[in-house]
Structure formats: structure tokens, C-alpha cells
From Swiss-Prot:
One cellular component term from this protein's GO annotations in UniProt: plasma membrane
Name assigned to this protein: Na(+)/H(+) antiporter NhaB
Protein topology in the membrane: Multi-pass membrane protein
Source organism of this protein record: Pasteurella multocida (strain Pm70)
Gene: nhaB
Higher taxonomy: Bacteria, Pseudomonadati, Pseudomonadota, Gammaproteobacteria, Pasteurellales
Membrane-crossing residue ranges in chain numbering: 21-41, 88-108, 119-139, 143-163, 208-228, 247-267, 303-323, 357-377, 389-409, 447-467, 477-497
Compartment(s): Cell inner membrane
Length: 513
């Protein structure tokens, strides 16, 4: 093997060769266009390239190719290190949220696992169970990180799939078997396929639930906190500002959940086979019998910490990330987790995305320095105030469906804040636009795994291939939710939001600026 071949193999690892070559071409072309053609065109090309790296997340995590593009952008002068640093400091609370809150919830997984297991085994109606999973995921995602909620539900699904697969293969609960191979299933194959379809539908309902709940509060999604910081909204005000849009969307989302299960469309409707339920119930009883006093006390402690988390966030007793740090300290102290290695595992989930977020901010700095979004913002602001809301929602929604919604929200809220400071829009209109940006980035982004981190997390999990959940199938199953959430969100932003906000101000729940 030559050094050239070795270099190509090392560069971006197992990514497709065409993708590696494409990234190298981008790195060659960008400086040429920046210096000899137009910095504006080079800036837009960088944004398009960065969106491509996000869309290719299944082939290669965007941190590496996106990071290389951002590094080059800083090196050739498209932005400056000081501006990147300023963007990071301005959004430091989001970084704290990702580092500490996600890690804190990791230590509450046992409680969440217990809750979802009980839901799965105690509710026999598939429609009620689907609504319960969707609502539970929505409620938890309003206070916790959506990735962690999905991770817990994946753990439940993975555990139950493994239990049934072992028994169907002729083994016992505790036997070590390869659950990726079906060669020993035999006559239970049809039951296994039905169980896979059942788990697929529950996973999708849960993921959509995280989007329904995540849009409602300032801690539900990372971009929410960015918007809340720019608009100077506390937890309660953010919730009330979003309510005219998020409440109708939540209701219609739950109705959609009920209808797709009732009529068995878009891949939904599969029920839990009775044989599988019997095996899972027996497995759960065995686990309950093995549970010690120490284990029960840990669940109780985690429940108390959960109450503290909700109270701390609701009354904004500290920065979100700091509350997450208190969760880590309390959960590890009272549950006996004292090993540095055990604590370190909690941070594995969030730190890659935290690093990627810093790369986002580098691209945002380029967008600001090169005035890339100025024509779009000017076009939107030239419209009437009533039309501006719909246009912001639509532009955010389209971009969020193919790109990461944190990136999209950061760009748009920064540009809108600049328009406010330049006197192009008034404060009340700015606040309505902030709601349109938040809902526009959160709701239509359920269309593809590229937009919602929780969807991407499920797609890249070890459970997805086991239950035959591919990219195409996920998009297809998300389609009814995409249509309903996007359309209801748009109608609410255009026709309900302005009037409802005025009513909330008049009755004293919101303060006029």
C-alpha cells in the first residue's frame, strides 16, 4: 500500500471515497472562490457544504468534515477567531446544557427505564399505549434532553427485543446469544416480524413525542435556549409565548397518533403479540424479585431528584446547565456512583454534539461577517408584519427538514436580533418572530432524521437494524406527523399567535415590552 492510499484510507475513516474526494474538492475550491470571485458566493457555498455534511451524518459524523471546512474558513479570513469566541460565549448556556444536563439525566435512566417498562406491560390497548408513550416522551422532553429520553426508550425496546429473541431461539433469559441472527427462530418468525413492527411504531411515536414536548419549553431543545437567551425570556414566559402554537400542535399530534394506530396506516397499527407479552411479563417479574432494598431506594432518590429538576427549571433557580450539574452531584452521591470511569460514561453522549455545536457557531460567525442572510431577511421584512410570521416559519421549516435545527435557529434568531437593533422591526414583532423561528425549526424538522437529533440517534442506534427501521421507512412513518405538525403550526403562527399573545398580555400573564 502506497502512502497516498494509506492517507486516503485514514482520511475520514470508513466514509465513502466519493464523499472524501468531495470534501477535499470543497477545501480546494473555497479559497479560490473567496479570493478571486466573491466572498458572498464563497460564504453561501460554505453553508451549502456544511448542510451536506449534516445530511451525510449516517456516513460520517459532521464534526470532522464540517470542522475542516470551518477551520479553513477561519484560516482564509471568512471570519475571525475572536468572532467565533464571541459566538461561543454568547451561547455558553447551551454548551452548559449539553455538557451537564444530558450527563445528569444519564444518572436517572434507571427510573425512566422503570416507568416505560411498566407502561409497556400494564397497558394492553395499542392505541392507549401509543398515546401513553407519545405523551410521556413529550412531558419528559419538556424538562429533559430529548436524546436521553429516546436513549431510555431505545434501552427498553432493546432489552425486550433481546429477551424475546433469546426465548424464541430456544434459550433462557440469561443466556448469551447473538440477537442479530434469526437462523434459530424457526416457527416464531411471523411473531418476531409482528413484534418488530410493534416496536417500530412505538419508537416513532416516542420520537415524535420528544418533538411535541421539546418545542414547548426553553430546555426542551438546545436551540430553544439560544432563542430564549436572545429574547430574554425565562422558563415560564417562554412556555406561555409558545403556547398559542404548541398547544394546538400537541392536540393535533396526539389525534394523529390515535388515527394512524386506529386505521393501521403508514406502517402503524401492529399489536404486541400475546406470546411475546407473556414472555416479557415473566422476565419483568423475575427482575422485580431480584430487586434489593438498595435498588428500590435508588429509584426513590431519582424520583426526588426529578422533582427538584422540574422545580429548579420552572422557577429558574439557576442556569440550566448548573441545575444539570446539581443533578449529577445528587444522583451520583446518593446512588453510590463514585468511580471516575463510571461518571465519565455519562458525558460520552453529549460531548461530540457539543463539539459540533462549536463548529456551528464558527459557520454562524461566517454568515454574520459575510452578511449571507441579509437578502433573505430584507425580503421577509419587506412583507407586511402579518406575512412575516408565515415566511419566517416556512423558511425555517424547509431548512430544518434537511439540516440541523440548532444551526438554522441560531442563524435566524441572530439575523432577527440584528434587524431589531437596527430599528427595522419593533420589539413586539421581534418576539412574535422569535416564536415563529422556534416553532418553525422544531416542528417541520420531524420530516427527516437530519433535522431532529433524537430521530438521528434512533436511526444510528443498534436497535434500528434489529427492528428493520431504515432511513426511508423512518421518513415514511414520520410523514403523517410531518404534514399535520407543519400545517397546524403554520396556521397557528399566522392566525392564532398574534391575537393570543395580546390576550395573554391583557390578562397580565405576559408583560408588554
Amino acid at each position: 500500500m502506497s502512502y497516498t492510499q494509506a492517507f486516503l484510507r485514514n482520511f475520514l475513516g470508513t466514509s465513502p471515497n466519493w464523499y472524501k474526494i468531495t470534501i477535499v474538492l470543497f477545501l480546494i475550491i473555497n479559497p479560490i472562490i473567496f479570493f478571486f470571485i466573491s466572498p458572498f458566493i464563497a460564504g453561501w457555498l460554505l453553508v451549502a457544504e456544511f448542510i451536506l455534511t449534516l445530511a451525510m451524518a449516517l456516513k460520517c459524523y459532521p464534526l470532522q468534515p464540517g470542522g475542516l471546512l470551518a477551520l479553513e474558513a477561519v484560516a482564509i479570513g471568512m471570519t475571525h477567531p475572536e468572532h467565533v469566541k464571541a459566538e461561543i460565549i454568547a451561547n455558553f448556556e447551551v454548551i452548559l446544557l449539553l455538557i451537564f444536563m444530558v450527563a445528569g439525566i444519564y444518572f436517572m435512566k434507571r427510573l425512566l427505564l422503570f416507568v416505560f417498562t411498566k407502561l409497556l406491560l400494564s397497558i394492553r390497548s395499542k392505541m392507549v399505549l401509543s398515546l401513553a408513550f407519545c405523551l410521556s416522551a413529550a412531558f419528559l422532553s419538556a424538562f429533559l434532553d430529548a436524546l436521553t429520553v429516546v436513549a431510555v426508550i431505545i434501552s427498553v425496546g432493546m432489552g425486550f427485543y433481546g429477551v424475546y429473541h433469546k426465548v424464541a431461539s430456544g434459550n433462557n433469559f440469561n443466556d448469551s446469544t447473538d440477537i442479530t441472527k434469526d437462523d434459530k427462530i424457526g416457527e416464531n418468525k411471523d411473531t418476531l416480524e409482528q413484534f418488530r413492527a410493534f416496536l417500530r411504531s412505538l419508537m416513532m411515536h416516542s420520537c415524535v413525542g420528544t418533538a411535541l414536548g421539546g418545542v414547548m419549553t426553553m430546555v426542551g431543545e438546545p436551540q430553544n435556549l439560544i432563542i430564549a437567551e436572545q429574547a430574554k425570556w425565562a422558563f415560564g414566559e417562554f412556555f406561555l409565548r409558545m403556547l398559542p402554537v404548541t398547544l394546538p400542535v400537541l392536540i393535533c399530534g396526539l389525534v394523529t397518533c390515535f388515527l394512524v394506530e386506529k386505521f393501521g396506516v403508514f406502517g402503524y397499527g401492529a399489536k404486541l403479540p400475546r406470546k411475546v407479552w407473556g414472555i416479557l411479563a415473566k422476565f419483568d417479574r423475575n427482575n422485580q424479585q431480584k430487586m434489593s432494598q438498595q435498588d428500590r431506594l435508588k429509584l426513590f432518590v431519582q424520583a426526588l431528584i426529578g422533582i427538584w429538576l422540574v422545580v429548579g427549571l420552572a422557577f429558574h433557580l439557576a442556569a440550566v446547565g448548573i441545575i444539570g450539574l446539581t443533578v449529577i452531584i445528587l444522583a451520583t452521591s446518593f446512588c453510590g456512583v463514585t468511580s471516575e470511569h463510571a461518571i465519565g460514561k455519562a458525558f460520552q453522549e453529549s460531548l461530540p454534539f457539543t463539539a459540533l455545536l462549536v463548529v456551528f457557531f464558527s459557520v454562524v460567525a461566517v454568515i454574520i461577517d459575510q452578511h449571507l442572510f441579509a437578502p433573505i431577511i430584507q425580503f421577509v421584512l419587506a412583507a407586511s408584519e402579518h406575512t412575516q410570521l408565515a415566511l419566517f416559519y416556512i423558511f425555517n421549516g424547509l431548512l430544518s427538514a434537511i439540516s440541523d435545527n440548532v444551526f438554522v435557529a441560531t442563524v435566524y434568531i441572530n439575523e432577527t436580533k440584528a434587524a431589531l437593533e437596527a430599528g427595522l422591526i419593533a420589539q413586539p414583532q421581534y418576539e412574535l418572530l422569535a416564536v415563529a423561528i422556534n416553532t418553525g425549526t422544531n416542528l417541520p424538522s420531524v420530516a427527516t432524521p437530519n433535522g431532529q437529533a433524537a430521530f438521528l440517534f434512533l436511526l444510528t442506534s443498534s436497535l434500528a437494524p434489529l427492528i428493520r427501521l431504515s432511513y426511508g421507512r423512518m421518513v415514511y412513518m414520520a410523514l403523517p406527523y410531518t404534514i399535520v405538525l407543519s400545517c397546524i403550526g403554520l396556521l397557528a403562527v399566522e392566525y392564532i399567535l398574534p391575537g393570543a399573545t395580546n390576550v395573554l398580555i391583557q390578562i397580565g400573564l405576559l408583560k408588554p415590552m
